[in-house]
UniProtKB/Swiss-Prot annotation:
Protein name, as recorded: 7-cyano-7-deazaguanine synthase
Cofactor note (record): Binds 1 zinc ion per subunit.
Coiled coil feature spans: none
Binding positions for Zn(2+) per the UniProt entry: 202, 217, 220, 223
Transmembrane segments: none
Enzyme superclass (EC): ligase
E.C. no: 6.3.4.20
Top-level taxon of origin: Bacteria
Catalytic reaction(s) noted: 7-carboxy-7-deazaguanine + NH4(+) + ATP = 7-cyano-7-deazaguanine + ADP + phosphate + H2O + H(+)
UniProt KW Nucleotidyltransferase keyword: no
High-level lineage: Bacteria, Pseudomonadati, Pseudomonadota, Alphaproteobacteria, Hyphomicrobiales
SUPFAM superfamilies in alphabetical order: Adenine nucleotide alpha hydrolases-like
InterPro entries to which the protein is assigned, alphabetical: QueC, Rossmann-like_a/b/a_fold
Cofactor(s) needed: Zn(2+)
C-alpha cells in the first residue's frame, strides 16, 4: 500500500471528487507527508467540499500509515472566479455544448488559477511537489487539463518562484477504468468503497441517487464518464 520513495512533502489539489481522492492515495504512497488544498470558488453547489472531510476521515481509518502522513487541509476562497465565469458550474443553467466544442461546464482558467494559488501556498510552506488530477484521456476536453498546459505552467511557476516546482499528474494518461484500478492497487477494496460512497463527481450535486459507482444524477458528462469507467473496471475490460 505504501512506497517510501521520498522524504518530501506534497500538496494535493483535493476537491472531494474521485480523481483527487485517487491522487491523494497516490501521493500518500510516495511522500513522507501530504497536505491537501481545496477551493471554494462560487461553484453552484458545495457537495464536493463537504465530501472532503469525510474522505479524509476515511483515509485515516483505512491506514495508520496514511493517518500519520496526512497533514494540514487548506481551503481557499476565490469568489472572483465565479464573478467572471458564466458557466454551468457557477450558474444554475442547463449543461450544454458550446459552439467551440466545449461543454459550458468549462470554467476558463480554473486549473491555472488553482495551481497558481496552490504553488503560492506551497512556496510559503516549503513544498515543491504539487499533485493534481488533471487528465486528457477520459475528460470533457478542457484545455487546462492537457499535459502541454500543465508542463508549460510548471515551467512558468518554477521561473516565477525561482524554485523548482514539480506538478505531478498521475492520472494524465489514465482513463476512468484505469483510475478505478489505481485506487484498487493503492488501497484495495477499502479505498474503492470509500471513493464510491464518499467522493462526489456529479456536476449537479445530486446525492439522492445511488449507483454502483457512487452518487450522482447519472446524466451529466462527469457522471457518464465515472459510470463508464466503473463498468469497464468492474467487468475487467
Amino acid at each position: 500500500m505504501t512506497d517510501h520513495s521520498s522524504d518530501k512533502t506534497a500538496l494535493v489539489l483535493f476537491s472531494g471528487g474521485q480523481d483527487s481522492a485517487t491522487c491523494l492515495a497516490w501521493a500518500l504512497a510516495r511522500f513522507a507527508r501530504v497536505e491537501t488544498i481545496g477551493f471554494d470558488y462560487g461553484q453552484r453547489h458545495l457537495i464536493e467540499l463537504e465530501c472532503r472531510a469525510r474522505l479524509l476521515d476515511g483515509f485515516r481509518a483505512i491506514s495508520d500509515d496514511w493517518a500519520a502522513k496526512l497533514g494540514d487541509n487548506h481551503t481557499l476562497t476565490i469568489p472572483t472566479l465565479a464573478e467572471i465565469s458564466d458557466t454551468a458550474l457557477t450558474r444554475d443553467v442547463a449543461i450544454a455544448m458550446g459552439a467551440d466544442g466545449l461543454p459550458n461546464t468549462f470554467v476558463p482558467g480554473r486549473n491555472l488559477i488553482f495551481l497558481n494559488f496552490a504553488a503560492a501556498l506551497a512556496y510559503r510552506r516549503g513544498i515543491t511537489d504539487i499533485v493534481g488530477g488533471m487528465c486528457e484521456t477520459d475528460y470533457s476536453g478542457y484545455p487546462d487539463c492537457r499535459n502541454d498546459t500543465i508542463q508549460a505552467l510548471q515551467t512558468a511557476l518554477s521561473l516565477g518562484m525561482a524554485r523548482d516546482i514539480t506538478l505531478h499528474t498521475p492520472l494524465m494518461w489514465r482513463d476512468k477504468a484505469a483510475t478505478w484500478q489505481l485506487a484498487q492497487d493503492l488501497g484495495g477494496d477499502a479505498l474503492v468503497d470509500l471513493i464510491r460512497e464518499d467522493s462526489h463527481t456529479c456536476y449537479l450535486g445530486e446525492r439522492g441517487a445511488r449507483h454502483d459507482w457512487g452518487y450522482g444524477c447519472g446524466e451529466c458528462p462527469a457522471c457518464r464518464l465515472r459510470a463508464k469507467g466503473w463498468i469497464e473496471y468492474a467487468s475487467g475490460i
